[in-house]
Regions:
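A conserved beta-strand element that flanks and buttresses the S-adenosyl-L-methionine
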Residues: 83
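A short glycine-rich, Lys/Arg-flanked "PGG" loop and its adjoining helix->strand segment in the class I
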Residues: 97-109
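Class I (Rossmann-like) S-adenosyl-L-methionine-dependent methyltransferase catalytic domain
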Residues: 1-23, 28-74, 91, 95-98, ...
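Short catalytic micro-motifs in class I SAM-dependent methyltransferases
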Residues: 86-87
């Protein structure tokens, strides 16, 4: 899978890749981690299943896999970039809002947040998100798009997703 365009856009706001740290929150297969590490960014890639991430880390010393259940994981350290693509919608509203707040708090001032959130019949943007995003970030981009998904292991048939995209700089 290819890197998400919002991650490419977000990385451009970093001043010096070689001195930057990124948190890939819910890294999955590592598609965003690989892109960031190849830029020279030090990446903490966190997911509950890190088998694929560990394989990537063998060949790329900039990727540091961490096995964790994000619903109760305490973020350690500060970051210049936080990436959370299509992960928070799987949590209940209170947990998703707390996780977004934790991600905000681990960002350095001027740090970049790249967030995507699937919206559909099951998933709605949690009430607390708007308050956090508008009060803590200078918005670079915020939009909702419908995308075509060719299918994946959980749902192999082609289908669409409505996705909320947010790119912001921490105030």
């Amino acid at each position: 899978m290819k890197v998400m365009p919002i991650v490419v856009a977000g990385a451009k706001f970093l001043q010096d890749y070689s001195k930057s740290r990124a948190l890939d929150y819910g890294a999955g297969t590592g598609r965003n981690s690989i892109y960031l590490a190849n830029l020279g960014i030090d990446v903490m890639a966190v997911d509950q299943d890190i088998e694929e991430l560990e394989k990537l880390a063998i060949n790329n010393k900039m990727i540091h896999p961490v096995k964790a259940d994000l619903r109760d994981w305490e973020i350690q350290g500060k970051f210049d970039l936080v990436v959370a693509t299509n992960v928070l919608q799987f949590f209940d509203n209170d947990t998703a809002t707390r996780c977004l707040n934790d991600m905000t708090n681990c960002l350095n001032s001027g740090g970049v947040l790249c967030l995507t959130y699937i919206l559909d019949k099951k998933f709605f943007l949690p009430v607390g998100f708007e308050e956090i995003l508008t009060s803590k970030f200078k918005m670079i981009n915020s939009e909702t798009k419908v995308i075509q998904d060719p299918g994946h292991p959980d749902f192999p048939e082609p289908h669409q997703h409505k996705i909320f995209y947010f790119l912001g700089i921490k105030k």
